[in-house]
């Protein structure tokens, strides 16, 4: 007798299997809906989101709305994306800085520049950050090929007048130092394109001589003590980006429309009560960020949805600082907070640029909760 062969009806087996698959998928869908409606699942999601925000250093005010956690916010994702982008940029910068024309220095072990630097006058770029260096030596004038001076987050208290002899200088970044003034000789650097003096906290004015800087397209003097827009800034005819947020401005000059090329204007965290009609003459302005706490008069056309202008009004309720002492720790804490604010706003502005339908008027409400 040969082998016994059992023949199945394949169509019956397939129908049985497909029925079971459909039942399993229906059960999965029903279970997913149950979990979605479950308060415990929502609480777990919010708790995980809050924990992640805290690890990233995002303040509570940015992900809470009216006392509720907003897990749909894209800010955390944006900050993470920016962090990855910055890391990638740093790798590229590091490769670039291996050039014999680039000098790089960082770390709190450095209290002054190395003596050997004086002999390397061929250098074109300095990248010095997060050190305890307080003084930039006068021999900097020997570096006639210098194009970039990137000196953020040090302890620099003053810049030498000799900096004005760097005729090829294009970028100067002295943000988050301890500067109280800028030398008028900087106005002799006629090829300067970018100037960043943000986060020095006590800087109150820029010298009139900087009016000579006709190539400047970017100025950041945020987080200082400016009570008005410096006259020299109004004479920078090619200026495209001006950040004067977190200062003591109570009004804007009536001739603000002299900045015909201005595209981005950041004014938030000041004491402005109105915006002048001259703002309407800034035809190239595409981004305007103000604090709406004190504003009582805004030209209607600025909020017109038909214009390309993104008008952002931030309504902020800062933590009460009553009783805070002006100690060194308090100053450093303020410096760190201002630095985080700038990073947050960069992420927010980049997010605005990526939206397909950008609101013409945006309000951010933040609050503090004391337990």
Swiss-Prot record:
It comes from the Eukaryota. Keywords: Leucine-rich repeat, Repeat. PANTHER family: LEUCINE-RICH REPEAT-CONTAINING PROTEIN 2 (PTHR48051:SF16), PTHR48051. Pfam families: LRR_4, LRR_8. GO terms for biological process: cellular response to leukemia inhibitory factor. This is Leucine-rich repeat-containing protein 2. InterPro entries: Leu-rich_rpt, Leu-rich_rpt_4, Leu-rich_rpt_typical-subtyp, LRR_dom_sf, LRR_domain-containing.
